[in-house]
Amino acid sequence: MKNIFKMISLFVLVLFSFFYTDKVMNLINKNDPLMNKIDLLKDKYEILPVNAILEDNTIIPGVKGKIVDLDKSYDNMKVSGIFREDYLIYNELLPSELLSNNMDKYIIKGNSSNNKISLLVLGDSNNIDKINKDNITIFLNHKDISINNIKKLSKNSIYTYGNNGIYSDEILSNDNTIINRISNNKSIYCLSKDKNSDTLTVCNKNNMYVVIPNIIGDYVDVKNNISNGSIILLNNINNLDIIIKYIKSKGYDIVSLEELLTE
């Protein structure tokens, strides 16, 4: 019985010692000029999240923000004792609605908080050499999805366009297996030119989002309608180089679809 009492007493003593030490260290840290400086400046580096825009069955994704982790930032700087901006450690601030919780909605655009846009083209075995350009997002027809074709498009993000825009479980299973194994991206997007409940159902079933471009057309359509966050699907690639040049001349950054829609 005495041994049990001694063990309990020792455990309580150790626990109290840890608690007391932690309290003392927290007090010391709070009085450290470095900690005070990080605490004083942390709001300067805070970036609030941009919330998603939901309307009916559509969504424009939000963008994550960030906030300084005071304790981790202090731990990262205390050896040198000097405040360094590049040593700050951040925690994410999530938008109020996430894409992962709204897979049953059509993505109609990227967030407009920056100058990024995505340029989509429909690829096939006949035009692969012409569309193999940096950051162009390519949707290949089911019949054109092959190891050889995907290897030729190593610069690009690649997704399946099903059978000319018609998706099925069998097509998605086959195409996604090849794309996920060979390409540099994960096949998580289906493409639709308008709202289609069948497309939404089968793609959601396969853990994929459905994207409806907000601009579909050619040079004139791009010129008249482009804005931050635009998802552009070209009807053909006849003026691809001219369109790319125009987009860049207006200060837009052409990025992959995945990057554009990253929260």
Question: Where are the language model's segments positioned?
Answer:
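N-terminal hydrophobic targeting signals that begin at the initiator methionine
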Residues: 1-2
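Non-catalytic propeptide/linker segments at domain boundaries
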Residues: 34-114
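Hydrophobic membrane-insertion alpha-helices, especially the h-region
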Residues: 6-22
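Ser/Thr/Pro/Gly-rich low-complexity linker/stalk segments immediately outside membranes or between
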Residues: 24-38
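Catalytic domains of cell-wall/extracellular-matrix polysaccharide-remodeling enzymes
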Residues: 145-155, 159-263
